[in-house]
Design a protein with these regions (language model features):
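Charged, low-complexity surface segments at secondary-structure and domain boundaries
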Residues: 9-10, 134, 200-204
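Non-transmembrane, amphipathic alpha-helical segments
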Residues: 50-53, 138, 211
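Long, highly charged amphipathic alpha-helices
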Residues: 64, 106-107, 214-218
Length: 240
């Protein structure tokens, strides 16, 4: 049962208007409070030297999560929930990087209730957010699995804030070496492949494995949850 349409406000108290029922991805993405949370989370991470986690990242994750769900035959509404989870998945970083997935889930709970989302859908979204981080999360539902795959696939040089630091920071170096990344979902073969184009003059493939092995394991587990296998392809060569 849906809540009545909710009237919501911007951070400065300005009325935003009634949220649609069912709640849409577009409404969540464009809401001033959501955009503020995303911006502040990214600003906090910038202060401690992390790669970009702002609107570019969450926008890409939302689109990929939606596409994963649809290509794997999941209903349109569940794909919308994956996109909403993608928009909100990193807002917990505005509080602290540690346990940001769980913190973000609780923040999303308050936002989505204010927006009038149906309770079962809220629980689906916040459990996905709370489980998206590779160190302490699991694909507890389809939305979580799609979110994990989408989040871990965003490796690209555009995420590096200061290219001058790539000599000193392995995470920046590996991200900067990636010229192209694409999550290829083969719905017929039920196989999901992360395809990367890496400049070996900047970072060796082994450095990628050194820092992203846990992400690859999380991606494999997520693919299995969706009934697919997972693989990694680098510069046209299948590695996993």
């Amino acid at each position: 049962m849906n809540h009545p349409s909710a009237r919501t406000t911007a951070p400065d108290g300005t009325p935003v208007g009634e949220a649609p029922s069912p709640l849409t991805f577009e409404y969540v993405r464009e809401h001033p409070r959501v955009r503020l949370y995303v911006r502040m989370a990214d600003a906090a991470l910038e202060q401690i030297g992390y790669t970009e986690h702002g609107e570019r990242h969450v926008g890409l994750v939302s689109r990929i999560a939606y596409n994963v769900m649809r290509r794997m035959g999941r209903p349109e509404r569940m794909a919308d929930l994956a996109a909403i989870a993608g928009t909100l998945h990193d807002i917990g970083n505005s509080v602290n990087r540690d346990h940001h997935a769980q913190t973000g889930g609780l923040m999303a709970l308050m936002l989505l209730r204010d927006f009038g989302m149906q309770e079962e859908e809220i629980l689906t979204v916040i459990s996905a957010i709370g489980n998206h981080h590779e160190n302490d999360g699991d694909p507890v539902n389809d939305v979580a699995a799609a979110l994990i795959l989408a989040d871990k696939s965003d490796v690209h040089r555009t995420r590096v804030r200061n290219p001058d630091m790539i000599k000193f920071d392995i995470h920046d170096r590996v991200n900067y070496a990636v010229e192209k990344s694409f999550l290829n979902v083969d719905e017929d073969q039920k196989h999901i492949t992360l395809e990367l184009t890496i400049d070996p003059k900047i970072s060796h493939v082994m450095e990628y494995f050194e820092i992203f092995m846990t992400r690859m394991l999380a991606s494999r587990k997520a693919a299995l949850h969706l009934g697919a296998t997972f693989g990694l392809q680098v510069n046209g060569n299948r590695l996993v």
